[in-house]
Amino acid sequence: MIFSQGASPLKGEFSRIKFSIASPESILAHSRGEVLKPETINYRTFKPERDGLMCEKIFGPTKDWECYCGKYKRVRYKGIICDRCGVEVTTKSVRRERMGHIALAVPVVHTWFFRSVPSKIGALLDLSTKELERIIYYEVYVVINPGEPGEKQGIKKLDRLTEEQYFQIITEYEDNQDLEDSDPDKFVAKMGGEAIHMLLKNIDLDASAIHLRKVLKESNSEQKRADALKRLKVVEAFRKSYEPHKKTRKKPQGLFPEDELPEPYVYEGNKPEYMVMEVVPVIPPELRPLVPLEGGRFATSDLNDLYRRVIIRNNRLKKLIDIRAPEVILRNEKRMLQEAVDALFDNSRKANAVKTGESNRPLKSLSDALKGKQGRFRQNLLGKRVDYSGRSVIVVGPELKLHECGLPKSMAIELFQPFVIRRLVDRGIAKSVKSAKKLIDKKDPIVWDVLEKVIDGRPVLLNRAPTLHRLGIQAFQPLLIEGKAIQIHPLVCTAFNADFDGDQMAVHIPLSQEAQLEASLLMLSSHNLILPQSGKPVTVPSQDMVLGMYYLTKSRSRDLGEGQIFYSPQDVLIAYNEERVGLHAQIFVQYDGEIDQKFDSLRVLDTMTDLTAEKSAWLKAQIEKKCILLTTVGRVIFNQNVPKEIGFINRVIDKKVAKELIGRLSSEVGNVETAKFLDNIKEVGFHYAMKGGLSVGLSDAIVPETKARHIKSAQRDSTKVVKEYNRGTLTDNERYNQIVDVWQKTSNIVAEESYQKLKKDRDGFNPLYMMLDSGARGSREQVRQLTGMRGLIARPQKSMSGQPGEIIENPIISNLKEGLTVLEYFISTHGARKGLSDTSLKTADAGYLTRRLHDVAQDVIVTIDDCGTTRGLYVHRNIEEETSGQIKFREKIKGRVAARDIIDTLNNNVIVNSGEIITEELAELIQETAGVEEAEIRSVLTCESKIGICSKCYGTNLSVHELVEIGEAVGVIAAQSIGEPGTQLTLRTFHQGGTAQGGISETETKAFYDGQIQFEDIKTVEHTAINEDGVADLRIIVIQKNGKINIADPESGKILKRYLVPHGAHLHCKNGSLVKKDQVMFSSEPNSTQIIAEIPGIIKFADIEKGITYKEEVDPQTGFSQHTIINWRSKLRATETREPRLMIIDASGEVRKTYPVPIKSNLYVEDGQKVEPGDIMAKVPRNLDRVGGDITAGLPKVTELFEARIPTDPAIVTEIDGYVSFGSQRRSSKEIKVKNDFGEEKVYYVQVGKHVLANEGDEVKAGDPLTDGAVSPQDILRIQGPNAVQQYLVNEIQKVYQINAGVEINDKHLEVIVRQMLQKVRVEEPGDTDLLPGDLIDRSAFVESNQSVAEKVRITEKGDAPARIQDSQLHKVRDITKLNRELRKNSKNMIAFEPALQATSHPVLLGITSAALQTESVISAASFQETTKVLTDAAVAGKVDYLAGLKENVIVGKLIPAGTGLKRYKAIKLTGEGQESNATERVVEEPATREGFANER
């Protein structure tokens, strides 16, 4: 932005900001004068020195309306320039705006353009950074014009010469030096900034671009093409910075009031020589202040020191030039000046940075002022301090309403002081502001009355740090309270993640009318009951409230008055108040409203022993007719608070039921009723928790008597395992895994029994059990440790990369009630301490993940209603996922818009029409309809909006259950929804004390449904084995990998569930047979992969040599030897190679089948041994992830997926469908070939020792892994396309959150982020567009580039066309056809042409960090990371920031373009009744009514 001399800075509207390199002219245009002296202030007078760094003449007066010498004082002399001291009489605030300059004695290279990677200057001149450095720092001369002497000596332009070579030429050709510098025959070589300046000035960008494009097309050398491309990018950036200005000399719109720029400032684009500075700008003195300290010393900004060095060296150099000092001295001084300017602009890049005298730290340069957390962007522009705010400790306010908070009087009077003063003066209570202040200080009683009136209807905002999602700031209506702590409603604690152990909260006051309205309409706590991340309620009762409701609604048999029949709920209450009936008694009530059907009244009726058969039969009939209700007194009391529309809730109310109920209320009766209900159940909950007197004593933790028996049995089992190991039938790995399994099972059995014991104790009224069962406090895991056994403990890992933790195989048999032995205690401290240290370390990681997510998605805003796409996303029903507790089918489709009709295939009924929202009811219906296997829904991933996304593709806004409005910042909501639970994830291990759980390796797989078995791709062999009792046992063993067993419905043939059958599994069912639910279908060994003989024959070892490819380990305890394949590479010479494999040969010695054996395999056969089909020849051990609850694996996993990193040991994936064959073996790798029926073949090289999953002859599909390891998302994108990788990322991230933390995040949030990761494409062939090969550009920009050449042709032969038409040019088809018509008419040669070629590209998957840095907005990218690099690139290319996202608008201080800040709300007309107001330029003027504003919104 350019301000003319004397004009004040831009106050008006601007819509975009352009970045470019400052030319010397523009620096001088900004400047108010040259800084000539390094002095700042006079040490005696403390006044700024004239012409120094603080000079008043240049930068403006230090006192308002007063010149330096004091001749002019007072405002009446405004604008006069003093004739004595030359200072303009104005306000001192101009010292924040006015700039100066330093005129350099020699040109100096700007370090940003020289040191950036790749170096901009280096790319233009085709010099390496090392060579450039030698020229710039005056070590060598560079030839600018070889002239005649150069030609004779064979010297070319840009050659580097040493001092001797240079002087040799100069002395040899003395006459040559008399020629003018512009003479082409003169030999010119220079060094330093001057040389670079001349070279850059002489560059012809257009010619360079043509030459480099030619190299790209014609060169065969890969290196040359890569270099040319790197250079071309910089050349094109400079050329593009010219383009917009070639056509018009008008200014970019909105910067200046006039139509034209003032003449000197016509922007001509960047010239390369601007990268070398002749003038250095000096920033305003208020931005680098001198602050007086006590003791007469001054604290100064580092910039002043850096400027001082530049000025001192510059002045010294000028003097030396004047006195014609020797070249050596000059050169040294010039080099020092270059270094001083380098340090001023960027002091952190250099190894020898300028340090301060006393503390020896590097000085903060201009770059450092922008960079990092403490830089200008993040510290001051994105993180401003707020006035009208205060903070205090929070305490609970149980008597508050949901929308209220208690504000201490002392805080309120301070915050609302200006408003109170105004009221006091207006009402005549105080004469002046001063006297009003006195009244307030005296705490006059009238002040409190006024304060009450002032705060009436004025919301305040409460915020608790860290603000992880939007519910971390909510609005409340304040109530004045005594004391010094803020009171908050207990139900909003969950949203703030607050508790009352000393947490503090900040209060902010919305000042403007608009802010107050937005606070009370959008941010009021009673309007924010639903969590945006999942659409589930967030204001859910917890702890005491849950316990109270649970206690109230629980039934107890034989309580006072059981079996009585009441005429109405009112009668029940009267009887209870008269103590005729107990709180938990089961009674009958006549009820005519809706009834919640989840309670099995008839079953309970059968358990009531005191009823006669006759009475029982009558009651049964009445219950079935729904005239009478079997319930408890407590439930009647509870239902007094439930709105009639919901009906009678006849269940025990625990946390889960309460959450469900609040969710129903908010969608069925609205927020107002729900808020009332919440306040009522809060009262009820606290009241009955108090009445129940529920507290835990040691005797409530009951240890089951059977515990000792189970432990004995487990000890027997583990002894048996050890015996087998000693016999040599198990490897050490298998022994470990089996022992862990035994203890895991035992621990679970004991836990279940202790749980059942608690449940039966005192009729289910054991306080410990009630707390657990209601969900008030504690988990089954904690009860297991209290009353069962602590079980196995995880051994903490050293690394944080998230491999599965080892488990210590000695379990802790005691529980916490019995107390631990010293050894057990010592083992368990391990896990507990890790939990605490993890917590603190990992919170930072989660915070950084959130920041990256915000940055990548901050500009995703709903911009249009419907993008009109025909594409959608297919969602399949997956029973396996649903049973393992993952997200149900209905949750995935709820709140989305159907892309196609959803049809019930069984009867062809349309359930949902295309374009219709799938509501909760419809989703439930689809879930229940067996005929719907999949649905196609609109998704953000397939949205085709140019900017932002459309509301149809996003679906409903989860927090209001309606289609998302235009202007909703869905990107930020998505980032918060993923980041907030990320921070929760980190704290997971903390509460479990690091005990190991989960991960019992399931050896038997049971049927989930009744149905018919169908085999798919299953090959088997029969095998007879001798079992433990010495009896022969016939087994059917699967020898095919990736076989499946399907359970189908015998009538319709529809597949209900699919099971993957592992290689080596034993089948317990036949193809086509019927199975019952829970019948075992097959069993497998989970701890290892087996290599199984498929045919009979004799084993022959190939390349299996003792000490080279296998080692023999004799177990010291058992004396048995075990053969393990080892990595043989270190044992052999470089040329030698081995490939360990087992071969089966027949009697004639012919090889029938070969099996490669991976490293770490244990051999179970000897050379020459006879084998039968089904015999195990070798086992490859597997690592099982057994440690549950430790999210260390979770967060790094999420980060890895979001950053689209290639896994450490990725699987090799086939790119085509086909059949597998093995090729030759090399020293370190072997070949796997995949060939299809069309003769296409792909060869993959697999590292030796990597486990190959495919066998010779296996059929594979594109995208199938051929080896062990995780599949890389980049491979999925390359082979299966963008859709597959999007689905993969969303599902994998969901799994981590689901399994590791049980956190529910709606898919649409993940889709928003994944969409941002796939926004870019990489250009492959640019065709005739102006793109470059390898360019990374936005998909929409790529489409635009192709459209620009769509109707153009390239001239191949110009014929007799006019001179303006040349070969290879692009022209519009219609222009050329018109010309050709004329040429034909005149019988001339016509123009030959061909259609212009369009560019080709492939999609790119970027990690969130790269995606955030690649964003279109310069300001947003610069404030994220790598600030200097982003700004350098933007300046060279003359980029324009159109301020489309949220972040850039916050930085420049505008309203964000989301919500009420949208452009469409700029000129709202507000009308009261019977009056017409003018359109305002602000968002709102004075609203006539609140309702009016709400309707407008």
Swiss-Prot record:
Its cofactor is Mg(2+); Zn(2+). Zn(2+) 1 binds at residues 67, 69, 82, 85. Disulfide bonds: none annotated. Mg(2+) binds at residues 499, 501, 503. Keywords: DNA-directed RNA polymerase, Magnesium, Metal-binding, Nucleotidyltransferase, Transcription, Transferase, Zinc. It is an enzyme of class 2 (transferase). This is DNA-directed RNA polymerase subunit beta'. It comes from Pelodictyon phaeoclathratiforme (strain DSM 5477 / BU-1).
